[in-house]
Amino acid sequence: MPNPAELAAHHWGFAAFLLGVVGLLAFMLGVSSLLGSKAFGRSKNEPFESGIVPTGGARLRLSAKFYLVAMLFVIFDVEALFLFAWSVSVRESGWAGLIEATIFIAILLAGLVYLWRIGALDWAPESRRKRQAKLKQ
C-alpha cells in the first residue's frame, strides 16, 4: 500500500483542479451577490407569463390520458430510433437483419393493435363511445 506522500504526489493535479473549481465557484457567487439587483416586492413573487397578467392558478389537473399518450410516444419513439439504426446498417446486416427487423416491426404492430383494442388510444369517455356506436347502428 502506498504511503500518503506517494498518494499526494500522484493526485496533486486533481487536488489543484478541485481547489480551482471551488475558488471559481466562490468568486462567481460573491460577484453575483455584490453586483446583482436586490429588488423585493409583490411583483417579484408572481410568475412571469410573457408580460401578460397571470390568470387562474398554476395547478391544473390533467387527465391521465395525457400521461398515457406521453408514455406511448416515448416507447414508440425509442423503437423508431432502433429502426433508424437498422436502416443505416441494412446492407451490412443482410437477410438476417431484414428478418429481425420484420419481426421487430410485427411486434410493434401487435402492440399498437393491442393498445387500440383495449381503448388506450380513445379520448372520448366510454359513455360517449357507446352512444356513437348506437347511432351508427
Swiss-Prot record:
Enzyme Commission number(s): 7.1.1.-
Enzyme category, top tier: translocase
The keyword Protein biosynthesis appears for this protein: no
InterPro entries: NAD(P)H_OxRDtase_bac/plastid, NADH_UbQ/plastoQ_OxRdtase_su3, NDAH_ubi_oxred_su3_sf
Entry membrane topology: Multi-pass membrane protein
UniProt key word Signal: no
Domain of life of the organism encoding this protein: Bacteria
PANTHER family: NADH-QUINONE OXIDOREDUCTASE SUBUNIT A, NADH-UBIQUINONE OXIDOREDUCTASE CHAIN 3
Annotated protein name in UniProt: NADH-quinone oxidoreductase subunit A 2
Subunit and partners: NDH-1 is composed of 13 different subunits. Subunits NuoA, H, J, K, L, M, N constitute the membrane sector of the complex.
Keywords: Cell inner membrane, Cell membrane, Membrane, NAD, Quinone, Translocase, Transmembrane, Transmembrane helix, Transport, Ubiquinone
Gene this chain is encoded by: nuoA2
GO BP terms, alphabetized: cellular response to iron ion
